[in-house]
């Protein structure tokens, strides 16, 4: 805990509000709410915590807080702040999970579509459906009954669907728009279970067609009636009142929460939504946050009723639902004001003369959620069933949440057992003690520029990211992989000896005999005896074989074994870590070329120079005419020569310049 945090902990009020934890870069990494800010925030820095919370606390370098008037206000504000800052330790709903809906467009001559997103466009939506197949099945049936527009608005003749009675071609046939309004209402009635009227009409039409000996048309009506019956059978009716409901259940265990949502539409259970995540707050409070985020997503349509368990505060759920129905938890103006208040707090001075930002901020009264409840809750009711079928629905959601969470733990436990066994077996195969700690190294550079190396550490078969290390190559010029590895191994294990830090049980090099032998030489020079293996790749850059022993030999390992999978994970991870570091370093090392800023010399003409000359010195030594022959206008060539007449920067080379020239369209 640093001095800034210590000072701020003394300022914490006994009020409800929200707090924001930040990392060393000032990035918000966690947003929480509390009935008592002083007690809640201080609890992070005192006492013992589980592993997840300890990881969060280890990254906290600063904190802010916002004081509000009530617990409900803090709940509403917390959800807004999470959506705004997207902290990595908060619950974040998956944004790639869109269920399909049926949509009747808000047009003069509307269309019937299957879509994945609900928008505020005045259209009529039905759903969600469990998958696209189910939505399309309903749409195909509706198309056979209700001939919504399928053609364009500028057609001059009827379309194909007109001939099969699935489109009225309203533009060509000048259909009254009221016809479509009536059809839309009939679709609403049909999808809410009132299909008896439609079936009766179809049966009457079937009889008329049969009497008129129009047997094909009669068969079509018969098939549609049969399809309606089939669809009705597939959808189990959960409640006879046919209301749209979302049923929530949750379960917590071992620091994890699972939330199950059952979608009940027209009394039928059609789908469920499952989310599992670690929670750092009180379980009930994190569940409330989840509900708020759930309905802030426009893809989740607000139902007529929301069922929640008995142990959840109904008033708080009403607050977040009301805020979501309103469209935004805060208006843009209010959100900007919150930002200004959080990050423009007053400064206090303490006895140690250190300035510490005072972060007690009052939220304006207009954010009060209670004032909005009466009008907004008329649309959606929050229900806590106490008996009967409705109570059974909530219990079923809760039991499913428990089952899913237990399944996650069972799978994770099996994976741990497999990984632990793989580590033990790897030691037996190599004839060494169990390699609890494995360190792996890899180099990365392009044409010798920005050479780096990286080390990853696996403990008991799992990555220990706090032990990862990055190395900038200091003593090697150009692309010398072996010399770079010698430098890194010397630096790593000299320091380990000096500081008496943990040494690995096995070093797994990303490479073959060359890298292994260099590592062995360095270890011998340092007086260390650590087993070294080489993870060799094939021409497809995939883990191919394990080299070990003296002399080195290929260790027979099945590609389907857990030991081989472990080595593959280690090799992939060290390669990823090294190349990511290299890209970061290259980005920092970019510079402005002497060719930048020359009037008339844009990216395309720089590319032409790049393909004609090897380096800047070659351009400098060329004549104006030779530069112009590279398809550069003569006056621009003159400016190039004039600019390059000065000394070339020492660190400027053509490979670096090449990185700064955008590729021409179509070139690779």
From Swiss-Prot:
Residues 196-231 form the UVR domain. It is found in: Cytoplasm. Residues 14-91 form the GIY-YIG domain. Its main location: cytoplasm. Pfam families: GIY-YIG, UVR, UvrC_RNaseH, UvrC_RNaseH_dom. Keywords: Cytoplasm, DNA damage, DNA excision, DNA repair, Excision nuclease, SOS response. The UvrABC repair system catalyzes the recognition and processing of DNA lesions. UvrC both incises the 5' and 3' sides of the lesion. The N-terminal half is responsible for the 3' incision and the C-terminal half is responsible for the 5' incision. Belongs to the UvrC family. This is UvrABC system protein C. The gene is uvrC.
């Amino acid at each position: 805990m640093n001095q800034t945090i210590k000072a701020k902990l003394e300022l914490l009020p006994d009020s409800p509000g929200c707090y924001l934890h930040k990392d060393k870069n000032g990035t918000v990494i966690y947003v929480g709410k509390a009935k008592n800010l002083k007690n809640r925030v201080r609890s992070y820095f005192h006492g013992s915590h589980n592993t997840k919370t300890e990881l969060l606390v280890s990254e906290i370098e600063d904190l802010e807080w916002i004081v509000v008037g009530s617990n409900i206000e803090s709940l509403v504000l917390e959800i807004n702040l999470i959506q705004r800052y997207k902290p990595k330790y908060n619950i974040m709903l998956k944004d790639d999970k869109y269920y399909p809906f049926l949509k009747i467009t808000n047009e003069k001559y509307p269309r019937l579509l299957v879509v994945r997103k609900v928008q505020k466009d005045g259209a009529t939506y039905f759903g969600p459906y469990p998958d696209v197949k189910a939505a399309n099945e309903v749409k195909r049936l509706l198309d056979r009954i209700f001939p919504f527009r399928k053609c364009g608005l500028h057609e001059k003749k009827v379309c194909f669907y007109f001939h099969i009675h699935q489109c009225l071609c309203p533009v060509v046939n000048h259909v009254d728009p009221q016809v479509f309004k009536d059809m839309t209402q009939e679709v609403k009635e049909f999808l809410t279970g009132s299909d008896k009227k439609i079936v009766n009409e179809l049966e009457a039409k079937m009889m008329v067609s049969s009497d008129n000996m129009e047997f094909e048309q009669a068969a079509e009506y018969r098939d549609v009636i049969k399809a309606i019956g089939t669809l009705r059978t597939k959808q189990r009716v959960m409640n006879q009142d046919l209301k749209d409901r979302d049923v929530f259940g949750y379960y917590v265990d071992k620091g994890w929460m699972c939330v199950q949502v059952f979608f009940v539409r027209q009394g039928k259970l059609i789908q469920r939504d499952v989310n599992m995540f670690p929670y750092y707050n009180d379980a009930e409070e994190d569940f409330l946050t989840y509900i708020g985020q759930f309905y802030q997503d426009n893809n989740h349509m607000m139902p007529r009723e929301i069922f929640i368990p008995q142990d959840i505060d109904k008033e708080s759920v009403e607050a977040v639902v009301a805020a979501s129905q309103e469209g935004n938890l805060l208006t843009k103006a209010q959100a900007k004001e919150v930002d200004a208040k959080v990050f423009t707090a007053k400064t206090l001075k303490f006895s140690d003369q250190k300035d510490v930002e005072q972060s007690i901020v009052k939220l304006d009264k207009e954010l009060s959620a209670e004032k909005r409840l009466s009008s907004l809750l008329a649309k959606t009711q929050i229900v806590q069933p106490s008996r009967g079928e409705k109570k059974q629905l909530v219990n079923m959601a809760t039991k499913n949440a428990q089952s899913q969470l237990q399944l996650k733990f069972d799978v994770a436990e099996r994976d741990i057992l497999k990984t632990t066994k793989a580590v033990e077996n790897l030691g037996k195969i190599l004839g060494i003690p169990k390699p609890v700690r494995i360190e792996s190294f890899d180099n990365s550079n392009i044409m010798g520029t920005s050479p780096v190396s990286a080390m990853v550490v696996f403990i008991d078969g799992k990555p220990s990211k706090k032990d990862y290390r990055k190395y900038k190559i200091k003593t090697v010029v150009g692309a010398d992989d072996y010399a770079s590895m010698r430098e890194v191994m010397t630096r790593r294990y000299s320091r380990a000896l000096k500081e008496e830090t943990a040494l690995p049980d096995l070093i797994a090099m990303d490479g073959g005999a060359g890298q292994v032998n260099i590592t062995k030489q360095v270890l011998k020079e340092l007086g260390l005896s650590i087993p070294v293996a080489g993870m060799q790749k094939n021409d497809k850059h995939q883990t191919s074989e394990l080299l070990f022993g003296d002399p080195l030999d290929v260790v027979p390992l099945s590609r389907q074994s857990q030991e081989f999978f472990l080595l593959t994970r280690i090799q992939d991870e060290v390669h990823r870590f090294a190349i990511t570091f290299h890209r970061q370093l290259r980005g920092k090392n970019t510079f402005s070329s002497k060719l930048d800023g020359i009037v008339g010399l844009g990216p395309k003409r720089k590319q032409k120079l790049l393909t004609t000359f090897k380096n800047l010195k070659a351009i400098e030594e060329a004549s104006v005419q030779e530069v112009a022959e590279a398809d550069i206008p003569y006056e621009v060539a003159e400016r190039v020569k004039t600019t390059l007449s000065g000394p070339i920067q020492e660190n400027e080379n053509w490979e670096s310049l090449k990185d700064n020239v955008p590729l021409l369209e179509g070139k690779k």
